[in-house]
Amino acid sequence: MALFGSNDVTTAHSDYEIVLEGGSSSWGKVKARAKVNAPPASPLLPADCDVKLNVKPLDPAKGFVRISAVFESIVDSTKNKLTIEADIANETKERRISVGEGMVSVGDFSHTFSFEGSVVNLFYYRSDAVRRNVPNPIYMQGRQFHDILMKVPLDNNDLIDTWEGTVKAIGSTGAFNDWIRDFWFIGPAFTALNEGGQRISRIEVNGLNTESGPKGPVGVSRWRFSHGGSGMVDSISRWAELFPSDKLNRPAQVEAGFRSDSQGIEVKVDGEFPGVSVDAGGGLRRILNHPLIPLVHHGMVGKFNNFNVDAQLKVVLPKGYKIRYAAPQYRSQNLEEYRWSGGAYARWVEHVCKGGVGQFEILYAQ
C-alpha cells in the first residue's frame, strides 16, 4: 500500500464498459469495476454496501424529477438501511427545491422522517472545457447554500427523551453547533474539504422545536449550511453530466456495490444514463469522459511511493458507427467495439490518479 508513508505497493485495477445508443440519442449504459489493495485506507471493520438509484422524469423541461434511492449496508454484522424518495425541481436558474420522505433502520430499530429544502447556487458552470471534454479541474455550480427542514415523528418514549435532551442541550450551551460539525459525519468531511481548499461553513441549527401531529408530537429542525461545490474536480462533474434533466425522457437507474475488508476496497457500478454522449457538431458525437476510477482518483490523493495501475476501457458504438478521433488512441478494434489498455491510456490513468490532468476525447460518427 502506498498511502500515509507506507512503503508497500498500491495496485489499482479498473475495468470500464460504455455501450452507446444510435442516432441522436445521448443515452448509454456504463459498467464500472474498480479494486484497490489498500488496507491502511480501509475502515477498521468490514463494510458491505449496496445502492440502488432511480431517476424518473416528471417535467424534464423544468428539471422536475423524482429520485428514489435505497442504501443497504452491513457493518460489524449490523444491517442498516436508508430509503428516500424525493421530488426535485428548478424553481429558478439559481435555486432548486426538494420535498421528500424516507425511512432509516439500524438493526431492529427503524423510523420514518420527512424533509423539504432548497439549494441556492451562486453560479453554474458551463465552460468550454467541459464541452470539449478535457479533464481539467472544472468547478461545479459554485458555492451552494442549503436550507433544510426536517420532521421526525416522536412516536415512542426513547425518541421523545432523545429529542427533549437535544433541545435542552442547544438551549444550555453555545457549542452545540461545534459538536455537530466536529463529531457528526460532517467533521471528517469538513477536514478533508478544507485540506483540499474547498471551504465549507459549519452546520447551523437555526430551529429546533416540537409540533403536534395527527399521531402525536413531531420534532422539527431547520439546518442551514454552505459548502464549496466549486471545489469538486472533473471526475465528479462527469457523474453529474451523466444526468442532464433535459435529456431524461425515460427513467435512469444506477446499481452500485461497495465492499471493504482487510485486503482492500472493491466497487461495482452498473447504470443507464441520459448523458453519455453529446452532439459535437458536423455529424460527430462526443463520448463524455468516463468517470475516472472513483476510488483511485479520490481515495488515493495521499503521499504514496509505489503505485501501479491496471486499467481497461471498452466502448461499443451503435452499428455502422466508427471512431473518427481518439486521445489516447485505442489499442484494438473489432467492428463497433473498441478497447483501450496499457500504453498511453495507462499513463493517462496513472497521471490522473496522482492528481494530474490530461486529454481524453472520443469522437464518433456514421
Curated annotation (Swiss-Prot):
Protein name as catalogued: Bacteriochlorophyll a protein
GO MF entries: bacteriochlorophyll binding; metal ion binding
Residues annotated to bind bacteriochlorophyll a 4? 290
Assembly mode? Homotrimer. Each subunit contains 7 molecules of bacteriochlorophyll a.
Q: What's the encoding gene here?
A: fmoA
State the species of origin: Chlorobaculum tepidum (strain ATCC 49652 / DSM 12025 / NBRC 103806 / TLS)
Q: What keywords does the record list, in alphabetical order?
A: Bacteriochlorophyll, Chlorophyll, Chromophore, Electron transport, Magnesium, Metal-binding, Photosynthesis, Reaction center, Transport
A GO biological-process term: photosynthesis
Which residue ranges traverse the bilayer?
none
Residues reported in the UniProt entry to bind bacteriochlorophyll a 7 = 297
Matching entries from Gene3D superfamilies are given as: Bacteriochlorophyll A
**Residues reported to bind bacteriochlorophyll a 3:** 298
